[in-house]
């Protein structure tokens, strides 16, 4: 269940970040307006994938925020060639701990 939930978070994150990045390319870098169509599809898929989480809405979206932080840093580093420093990674690690506690800690 944990692995599936993490997979849903990653899928949702890639769709949301990818969709946002396409808007960035279109508006800020003058790329084709057709990117807006792909963006709309990705952001729609993001909204759907998020509903697959077993947790309630508030917990799932709060935890997703931590995953979004991590994926955004990785996206910037790998796709946009941004230099990521140790404080970026530290912040991402702290966010990940929060995600793990919120989503997967044993609630007795």
Swiss-Prot record:
Pfam entry (one): UPF0060
Keywords carried by this UniProt record: Cell inner membrane, Cell membrane, Membrane, Transmembrane, Transmembrane helix
Xref: InterPro entries: UPF0060 (IPR003844)
Protein localization: Cell inner membrane
Membrane topology: Multi-pass membrane protein
Keyword Cell membrane in annotation: yes
Family, per entry: Belongs to the UPF0060 family.
PANTHER family: UPF0060 MEMBRANE PROTEIN YNFA
Protein name: UPF0060 membrane protein sll0793
Native organism: Synechocystis sp. (strain ATCC 27184 / PCC 6803 / Kazusa)
Classification of source organism: Bacteria, Bacillati, Cyanobacteriota, Cyanophyceae, Synechococcales
